[in-house]
Amino acid sequence: MSVNPKAFPLADSGLTQQILDLVQQASHYKQLRKGANEATKTLNRGISEFIVMAADTEPIEILLHLPLLCEDKNVPYVFVPSKAALGRACGVSRPVISASITTNEASDLLPQIQAIKLAIEKLLI
């Protein structure tokens, strides 16, 4: 399991933990879409807060269309080291290569989502 050098920006271990915790909470609040195809749909519909991708995806090219789309739509994106850990955080028994946290104005998660978005945007600079 190796992290692909094309996976930029890669979250450090502290941020990865925060992101995975938020992904887990978002799945309880029904604010999570799992998989590259569903992440693409949320971007096209304009309901994505940010995108999380797995850096150990093989081949990584199957999700490299997402950063381009994120930049078009001005949505932050980040890579986490492990698809297995992302899958566990999503509450699925399989590895997940991509997930999208979706928008909900009345959500209890809004402050955490804003904090993570800010941290991701700092990585992109």
Swiss-Prot record:
Keyword hit for DNA repair: no
SUPFAM superfamilies attached to this UniProt entry: L30e-like (SSF55315)
Superkingdom of this protein's organism: Eukaryota
Keywords from the named record: mRNA processing, mRNA splicing, Nucleus, Ribonucleoprotein, Ribosome biogenesis, RNA-binding, rRNA processing, Spliceosome
Localisation per UniProt entry: Nucleus, Nucleolus
UniProt record, GO biological process: maturation of SSU-rRNA; mRNA splicing, via spliceosome; snoRNA guided rRNA 2'-O-methylation
Entry's Gene Ontology cellular component terms: box C/D methylation guide snoRNP complex; nucleolus; precatalytic spliceosome; small-subunit processome; U4/U6 x U5 tri-snRNP complex
InterPro entries xref list: eL8/uL1-like, H/ACA_rnp_Nhp2-like, Ribosomal_eL30-like_sf, Ribosomal_eL8-like_CS, Ribosomal_eL8/eL30/eS12/Gad45, Ribosomal_eL8/Nhp2
Gene3D superfamilies xrefs: 3.30.1330.30
Principal location class: nucleus
UniProt GO MF annotations: RNA binding
Function per UniProt: Common component of the spliceosome and rRNA processing machinery. In association with the spliceosomal U4/U6.U5 tri-snRNP particle, required for splicing of pre-mRNA. In association with box C/D snoRNPs, required for processing of pre-ribosomal RNA (rRNA) and site-specific 2'-O-methylation of substrate RNAs. Essential for the accumulation and stability of U4 snRNA, U6 snRNA, and box C/D snoRNAs.
Similarity comment text for this entry: Belongs to the eukaryotic ribosomal protein eL8 family.
Subunit structure: Component of the U3 snoRNP particle. Binds to the C'/D and B/C motifs in U3 snoRNA. Component of the 25S U4/U6.U5 tri-snRNP particle, a subcomplex of the spliceosome. Binds to the 5' stem-loop of U4 snRNA.
Full protein name: 13 kDa ribonucleoprotein-associated protein
Organism per entry: Schizosaccharomyces pombe (strain 972 / ATCC 24843) (Fission yeast)
Phylogenetic placement of the source organism: Eukaryota, Fungi, Dikarya, Ascomycota, Taphrinomycotina
